[in-house]
Amino acid sequence: MQPITQIPLTFDTVVNLLGSASGIGWILNYILMTYYSFRDKTYSMSMLPLCCNIAWEFVYGILCPSSTFVVRPVILSWLVLNCLVVYAAIKYSPNEWAHAPLVQRHLPLLFTVGIAACTGFHIALIRKFDPATAFLWSARSCQVLLSIGGLFQLLCRSSTKGGSYVLWLSRFLGSICGVLKMTLMWKYGESRFPWLDDPLTAYCIALWIISDVLYGVVFYSLRSKELAGAGKAKAI
């Protein structure tokens, strides 16, 4: 009988497919965020995760790029698309901050400072660890911020504007594919990094998965109420 730890013949194929699915999922997510931001005249990703994400893509796409043939082009494509997301956010975020005039008047400055601060954070992690380790921990930080930030943005707005089921699923499934890829590499000894055997890593994964699942539940609840309200309005 084949030992359970022996790498299957299809290992590389599965890992590459999962990596590609993750990259495509996030590309689709950025495209949809830009579309819904312009359609609904709002921003789809909350401000701090947006700053952290684009800073991560800038650092690991330009300042400290991966030597892997596929990884760098994917990150650069994310960076280009995310610039459109940031542009839409700066253009339409004042619509969401009428209750806070000080923030509303200085949103471009706040985005600039936020991106600069997050860039410094990612660089500091590289200086503390090696680039590959910092790459993973920075990505985990971005993922946790994005998932929790998205959930609380949805709760605060009490509205599904700027979002959709496809937008949510592209992010969620893209991230899940990335986790499955890393889990396979860890299981078969192809990764030198701690994964599910590390408590902090396992906690971060659990935290963003729970947050993203709750996002789907809350989105469904809000969308159902919106559709019911629209139906009543038509009936009147």
From Swiss-Prot:
It holds the Pfam family Pyr4-TMTC. Pathway: Secondary metabolite biosynthesis; terpenoid biosynthesis. It is found in: Membrane. Disulfide bonds: none annotated. It comes from the Eukaryota. GO terms for cellular component: membrane. Keywords: Lyase, Membrane, Transmembrane, Transmembrane helix. It is a multi-pass membrane protein. The chain crosses the membrane at residues 13-33, 45-65, 70-90, 106-126, 135-155, 166-186, 200-220. Terpene cyclase; part of the gene cluster that mediates the biosynthesis of anditomin, a fungal meroterpenoid. The first step of the pathway is the synthesis of 3,5-dimethylorsellinic acid (DMOA) by the polyketide synthase andM. DMOA is then converted to the phthalide compound 5,7-dihydroxy-4,6-dimethylphthalide (DHDMP) by the cytochrome P450 monooxygenase andK, which is further prenylated by the prenyltransferase andD to yield farnesyl-DHDMP. Further epoxidation by the FAD-dependent monooxygenase andE leads to epoxyfarnesyl-DHDMP. Belongs to the paxB family. PANTHER family: PTHR42038, TERPENE CYCLASE AUSL (PTHR42038:SF2). This is Terpene cyclase andB. The gene is andB.
